C-alpha cells in the first residue's frame, strides 16, 4: 500500500471513528436529556407528595382542635346540667332558710338565741357560694312584669298584665347562666314605686 492509500484509509478510519463518536455523544446527550426529564418528573412528584403530606397534617391538626373544642363544650354542658340539677334541689332549702329568717324577724323573743342568729349568716354564705357558681336570684321589686321571669299569684286581676310592675316578691325566682330555673311568684301594681 502506498502512502496515499494508506493516508486515505487512515482518513476513512478517522471519519468512521468520528462518526461513531458523534453517534455515541448524541446517544449520551439523548440519554442525559431523558435522565434529566426523569429527574425533573421525580422532583415534581416529591413536591406534590410533600404538599399532600402538609395538607393532611393541617387537616388532622384542625380535626384534633375540633375534637378538643367539642369535648370541652360537652364537658361544660354536663357540668352545667349537673349544677343546674343541684341548684334545683337546693332552692327549696334556701326557701326554708329564708322563711325561718322571716319568722325570726317576726318574733322578738327568739332573736336572742345564738343558734337562731346564725341562720341568716348561713343563708348569706349559701347565697354567696351559689352565686359564684352562676345561680342568680330574681327578686327585684319595681321592675316591669316579664312573663319569662315572673308568675303572678292566681287571684291577680290585671287587664293588661305586661303594663304592671312587680310590687311584692312572694317567692324568689332563679336563673343559672341565663337559663330560668324557677320563675319568681309576684304581686303586681300599676305603680312602679310600690
UniProtKB/Swiss-Prot annotation:
Region (Disordered): 1-29
SUPFAM superfamilies: Coiled-coil domain of nucleotide exchange factor GrpE, Head domain of nucleotide exchange factor GrpE
Keyword ATP-binding: no
Ranges of biased composition (kind: Polar residues): 18-29
CDD domains linked to this entry: GrpE (cd00446)
GO CC, any one term: cytoplasm
Primary location class: cytoplasm
Keywords in alphabetical order: Chaperone, Cytoplasm, Stress response
Domain of life: Bacteria
Oligomeric form and interacting partners: Homodimer.
Main function: Participates actively in the response to hyperosmotic and heat shock by preventing the aggregation of stress-denatured proteins, in association with DnaK and GrpE. It is the nucleotide exchange factor for DnaK and may function as a thermosensor. Unfolded proteins bind initially to DnaJ; upon interaction with the DnaJ-bound protein, DnaK hydrolyzes its bound ATP, resulting in the formation of a stable complex. GrpE releases ADP from DnaK; ATP binding to DnaK triggers the release of the substrate protein, thus completing the reaction cycle.
Family of this protein: Belongs to the GrpE family.
Protein name: Protein GrpE 2
Species name: Buchnera aphidicola subsp. Baizongia pistaciae (strain Bp)
Gene of this entry: grpE2
Amino acid at each position: 500500500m502506498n502512502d496515499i492509500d494508506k493516508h486515505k484509509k487512515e482518513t476513512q478510519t478517522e471519519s468512521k471513528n468520528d462518526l461513531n463518536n458523534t453517534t455515541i455523544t448524541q446517544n449520551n446527550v439523548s440519554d442525559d436529556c431523558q435522565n434529566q426529564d426523569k429527574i425533573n418528573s421525580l422532583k415534581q412528584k416529591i413536591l406534590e407528595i410533600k404538599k399532600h403530606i402538609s395538607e393532611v397534617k393541617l387537616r388532622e391538626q384542625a380535626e384534633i382542635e375540633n375534637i378538643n373544642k367539642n369535648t370541652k363544650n360537652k364537658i361544660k354542658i354536663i357540668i352545667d346540667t349537673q349544677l343546674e340539677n343541684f341548684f334545683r334541689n337546693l332552692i327549696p332549702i334556701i326557701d326554708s332558710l329564708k322563711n325561718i329568717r322571716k319568722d325570726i324577724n317576726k318574733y322578738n323573743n327568739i332573736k336572742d338565741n345564738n343558734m337562731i342568729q346564725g341562720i341568716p349568716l348561713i343563708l348569706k354564705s349559701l347565697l354567696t357560694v351559689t352565686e359564684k357558681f352562676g345561680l342568680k336570684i330574681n327578686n327585684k321589686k319595681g321592675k316591669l312584669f316579664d312573663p319569662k321571669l315572673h308568675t303572678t299569684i292566681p287571684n291577680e286581676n290585671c287587664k293588661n298584665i305586661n303594663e304592671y310592675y312587680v310590687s311584692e316578691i312572694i317567692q324568689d325566682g332563679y336563673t343559672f347562666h341565663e337559663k330560668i330555673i324557677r320563675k319568681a311568684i309576684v304581686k303586681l301594681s300599676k305603680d312602679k314605686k310600690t
